[in-house]
Protein backbone atom coordinates (compact mmCIF):
# COMPACT_ATOMS: atom_id res chain seq x y z
CA UNK A 1 0.00 0.00 0.00
CA UNK A 2 3.03 2.33 0.49
CA UNK A 3 0.94 4.57 2.72
CA UNK A 4 -1.96 5.00 0.32
CA UNK A 5 -5.43 3.53 0.62
CA UNK A 6 -6.91 1.52 -2.21
CA UNK A 7 -10.31 -0.02 -2.57
CA UNK A 8 -11.75 -2.63 -4.88
CA UNK A 9 -14.66 -0.80 -6.48
CA UNK A 10 -16.55 -4.02 -7.26
CA UNK A 11 -15.92 -6.61 -4.53
CA UNK A 12 -19.01 -8.59 -5.55
CA UNK A 13 -18.85 -11.66 -7.78
CA UNK A 14 -21.82 -10.32 -9.74
CA UNK A 15 -21.62 -7.85 -12.60
CA UNK A 16 -22.34 -4.39 -11.23
CA UNK A 17 -23.89 -1.81 -13.59
CA UNK A 18 -21.64 1.01 -14.76
CA UNK A 19 -23.96 3.57 -13.20
CA UNK A 20 -23.39 1.98 -9.77
CA UNK A 21 -19.62 1.87 -10.33
CA UNK A 22 -19.67 5.58 -11.17
CA UNK A 23 -21.87 6.30 -8.15
CA UNK A 24 -19.36 4.53 -5.88
CA UNK A 25 -16.43 6.37 -7.46
CA UNK A 26 -18.10 9.74 -7.14
CA UNK A 27 -19.05 9.02 -3.51
CA UNK A 28 -15.31 8.64 -2.82
CA UNK A 29 -14.67 11.88 -4.69
CA UNK A 30 -17.21 13.64 -2.49
CA UNK A 31 -15.82 12.11 0.71
CA UNK A 32 -12.11 12.63 0.03
CA UNK A 33 -11.99 15.31 -2.67
CA UNK A 34 -11.81 14.51 -6.37
CA UNK A 35 -8.10 15.34 -6.57
CA UNK A 36 -7.44 12.71 -3.88
CA UNK A 37 -9.14 9.88 -5.80
CA UNK A 38 -8.23 8.04 -9.00
CA UNK A 39 -10.08 5.30 -10.83
CA UNK A 40 -8.32 2.57 -12.77
CA UNK A 41 -10.75 0.20 -14.45
CA UNK A 42 -8.70 -2.93 -15.20
CA UNK A 43 -9.75 -5.11 -18.14
CA UNK A 44 -8.53 -7.78 -20.55
CA UNK A 45 -9.33 -7.04 -24.18
CA UNK A 46 -10.93 -9.26 -26.85
CA UNK A 47 -10.86 -8.93 -30.63
CA UNK A 48 -13.44 -11.56 -31.52
CA UNK A 49 -16.52 -13.33 -30.24
CA UNK A 50 -14.67 -16.13 -28.45
CA UNK A 51 -15.22 -18.74 -31.15
CA UNK A 52 -11.57 -18.76 -32.34
CA UNK A 53 -8.12 -17.42 -31.58
CA UNK A 54 -7.49 -13.92 -32.86
CA UNK A 55 -4.28 -12.13 -33.90
CA UNK A 56 -4.70 -8.89 -31.94
CA UNK A 57 -2.18 -8.47 -29.13
CA UNK A 58 -0.98 -5.83 -26.73
CA UNK A 59 -1.54 -3.53 -23.77
CA UNK A 60 -3.35 -0.20 -23.95
CA UNK A 61 -4.91 2.51 -21.82
CA UNK A 62 -7.97 4.69 -22.44
CA UNK A 63 -9.07 8.10 -21.19
CA UNK A 64 -12.12 10.18 -22.02
CA UNK A 65 -11.88 12.68 -24.86
CA UNK A 66 -10.03 15.94 -24.22
CA UNK A 67 -6.98 16.74 -22.14
CA UNK A 68 -7.56 16.07 -18.44
CA UNK A 69 -5.62 14.84 -15.43
CA UNK A 70 -6.53 11.36 -16.66
CA UNK A 71 -4.12 11.82 -19.58
CA UNK A 72 -1.20 12.34 -17.19
CA UNK A 73 -2.20 9.24 -15.22
CA UNK A 74 -2.41 7.26 -18.46
CA UNK A 75 1.04 8.48 -19.53
CA UNK A 76 2.50 7.31 -16.20
CA UNK A 77 0.90 3.91 -16.76
CA UNK A 78 2.29 3.77 -20.30
CA UNK A 79 5.80 4.48 -19.00
CA UNK A 80 5.44 1.63 -16.51
CA UNK A 81 4.01 -0.67 -19.20
CA UNK A 82 6.95 -0.03 -21.52
CA UNK A 83 9.32 -0.95 -18.67
CA UNK A 84 7.39 -4.02 -17.48
CA UNK A 85 6.38 -5.46 -20.86
CA UNK A 86 9.64 -5.04 -22.83
CA UNK A 87 8.90 -7.86 -25.27
CA UNK A 88 5.16 -7.25 -25.62
CA UNK A 89 3.23 -4.93 -27.90
CA UNK A 90 2.18 -1.61 -26.37
CA UNK A 91 -0.71 -0.11 -28.36
CA UNK A 92 -0.53 3.71 -28.56
CA UNK A 93 -2.44 6.55 -30.19
CA UNK A 94 -0.51 9.82 -30.40
CA UNK A 95 -3.19 11.63 -32.43
CA UNK A 96 -3.67 14.13 -29.57
CA UNK A 97 -0.04 14.24 -28.43
CA UNK A 98 -0.07 11.54 -25.74
CA UNK A 99 -0.04 7.72 -25.94
CA UNK A 100 -3.50 6.90 -24.60
CA UNK A 101 -6.56 6.05 -26.64
CA UNK A 102 -9.54 8.33 -26.15
CA UNK A 103 -13.11 7.07 -26.01
CA UNK A 104 -16.31 8.27 -24.40
CA UNK A 105 -16.58 5.22 -22.14
CA UNK A 106 -19.30 5.86 -19.56
CA UNK A 107 -17.17 5.16 -16.49
CA UNK A 108 -14.42 7.52 -17.72
CA UNK A 109 -16.78 10.26 -18.83
CA UNK A 110 -18.95 10.27 -15.68
CA UNK A 111 -16.32 9.83 -12.94
CA UNK A 112 -15.38 13.11 -11.22
CA UNK A 113 -11.74 12.12 -10.66
CA UNK A 114 -8.83 11.17 -12.89
CA UNK A 115 -10.03 7.94 -14.51
CA UNK A 116 -8.45 5.48 -16.93
CA UNK A 117 -9.33 2.07 -18.32
CA UNK A 118 -6.50 -0.37 -19.00
CA UNK A 119 -6.75 -3.23 -21.48
CA UNK A 120 -4.22 -5.80 -20.34
CA UNK A 121 -3.63 -7.80 -23.49
CA UNK A 122 -6.15 -9.99 -25.33
CA UNK A 123 -7.91 -13.02 -23.86
CA UNK A 124 -8.55 -14.38 -27.37
CA UNK A 125 -4.90 -14.19 -28.44
CA UNK A 126 -3.15 -17.46 -27.64
CA UNK A 127 0.20 -15.77 -26.89
CA UNK A 128 -1.37 -12.99 -24.79
CA UNK A 129 -3.47 -15.47 -22.82
CA UNK A 130 -0.46 -17.67 -22.07
CA UNK A 131 1.40 -14.58 -20.87
CA UNK A 132 -1.52 -13.41 -18.71
CA UNK A 133 -1.79 -16.83 -17.09
CA UNK A 134 1.94 -17.01 -16.33
CA UNK A 135 3.42 -15.96 -13.00
CA UNK A 136 5.64 -13.40 -14.78
CA UNK A 137 2.73 -11.98 -16.77
CA UNK A 138 0.52 -11.58 -13.71
CA UNK A 139 3.33 -9.89 -11.80
CA UNK A 140 4.10 -7.54 -14.70
CA UNK A 141 0.45 -6.44 -14.87
CA UNK A 142 0.42 -5.75 -11.12
CA UNK A 143 3.78 -3.94 -11.28
CA UNK A 144 2.65 -1.81 -14.21
CA UNK A 145 -0.39 -0.53 -12.35
CA UNK A 146 1.42 -0.03 -9.03
CA UNK A 147 4.42 1.73 -10.60
CA UNK A 148 2.23 3.89 -12.83
CA UNK A 149 0.17 5.01 -9.85
CA UNK A 150 3.26 5.70 -7.75
CA UNK A 151 4.80 7.78 -10.55
CA UNK A 152 1.57 9.76 -10.93
CA UNK A 153 1.54 10.40 -7.17
CA UNK A 154 5.22 11.44 -7.22
CA UNK A 155 4.66 13.91 -10.05
CA UNK A 156 1.39 15.09 -8.48
CA UNK A 157 3.12 15.87 -5.17
CA UNK A 158 5.97 17.71 -6.92
CA UNK A 159 3.51 20.02 -8.69
CA UNK A 160 1.63 21.00 -5.51
Question: What do the predicted segments below correspond to?
Answer:
Residues 1-160:
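Active-site-proximal helix/loop segments of hydrolytic enzymes
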Amino acid sequence: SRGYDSELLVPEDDDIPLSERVRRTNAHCQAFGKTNVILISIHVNAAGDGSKWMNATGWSCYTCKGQTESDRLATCLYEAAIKNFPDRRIRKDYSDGDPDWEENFYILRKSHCAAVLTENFFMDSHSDLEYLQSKDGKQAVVDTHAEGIMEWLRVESSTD
